[in-house]
Amino acid sequence: MELGLSLGDAVTVADGGRLELVLGLGVGVGAGVRRGEEEERGRREDVVGAGRWAAMAAASPEPSVRLSLVSSLGLHWPSETGRSEAAARGFDVNRAPSVAAGAPGMEDDEEGPGAAPALSSSPNDSGGSFPLDLSGQGLRGHAEAAAQGGGGGGGGERSSSRASDDDEGASARKKLRLSKEQSAFLEESFKEHSTLNPKQKVALAKQLNLRPRQVEVWFQNRRARTKLKQTEVDCEYLKRCCETLTEENRRLHKELAELRALKTARPFYMHLPATTLSMCPSCERVASNPATASTSAPAAATSPAAAPTAAARTAVASPEPHRPSSFAALFAAPLGFPLTAAQPRPPPPASNCL
């Protein structure tokens, strides 16, 4: 015996008179049928199967056993034009099943289009089929339906949020517009009092024809602007101080580096040993005779007329003893020219030594 596996094909007789058993696996996917129609269809299949087995038993000498695994549920396969294509490509879950009659022998027994099984099932029907759609179109349809349902809810939420945003934008656009007189009066009031108590707030609002809340908000904004400006001024001042300190610190670091370099460098001069002061002989004479040097200076400063007189007096007062000699006797005769006074001796030159 030969076993052939096929999906949805009818039972065929192989060459040589042998029976080719066909394993029919039917999966009903889609809408179910009612219980009564299923029972009637099952009875018809049993009758047709019995007739076929009798014919095959008469034609075949060997005993044959029929294995039928066809479910009692309705087999909804494509029509005759698409039967060969379905048999060739097998079971396609992406293709929507048809609602026509499934059995090839039962097409003639159908009573007409009005006798098509109703696409409904009851929860109490134990033999009814369950609706299950695995096709891509069905999945896409469910996804689109869910998206439309969610989009409807989300659209409502978006519309409500957009409406609230519009309301907020309208309230934001409705800013307080003050006239020049009102602004000037509020500025003067702020200079006098940066904060207001409730009584002052009500009085000022009544005077300016405003609400107390508007006056309070204006004062809050004015205090915030004043604080911001003061903060900016302080920030600029601190920035300048920081820059000055940075420059001073850089200068001090530079001086410190120079001092360290001088400390570690080798000195350019050698320390000379201690020595004694030496004086030249002329300086020593000047230092030993201070009185002589002091008296000789006024004598040199006198007039030239008084100098011969003083020299003559000195020569007369202290005459030196004269010892005659043979050579002097030869020239004992008096000289014919008068004796002149001795020229004063110039003072010694000053010494250059220290």
Swiss-Prot record:
Residues 148-157 have a biased composition (Gly residues). Residues 98-175, 294-323 are annotated as: Disordered. Expressed in seedlings, roots, stems, leaf sheaths and blades and panicles. Residues 229-273 are annotated as: Leucine-zipper. GO terms for cellular component: nucleus. Residues 171-230 bind DNA. It is found in: Nucleus. CDD domains: homeodomain. The keyword Heme does not apply. GO terms for molecular function: DNA-binding transcription factor activity, RNA polymerase II-specific; sequence-specific DNA binding. Probable transcription factor. Belongs to the HD-ZIP homeobox family. Class II subfamily. This is Homeobox-leucine zipper protein HOX27. The lineage of its organism: Eukaryota, Viridiplantae, Streptophyta, Embryophyta, Tracheophyta. The gene is HOX27.
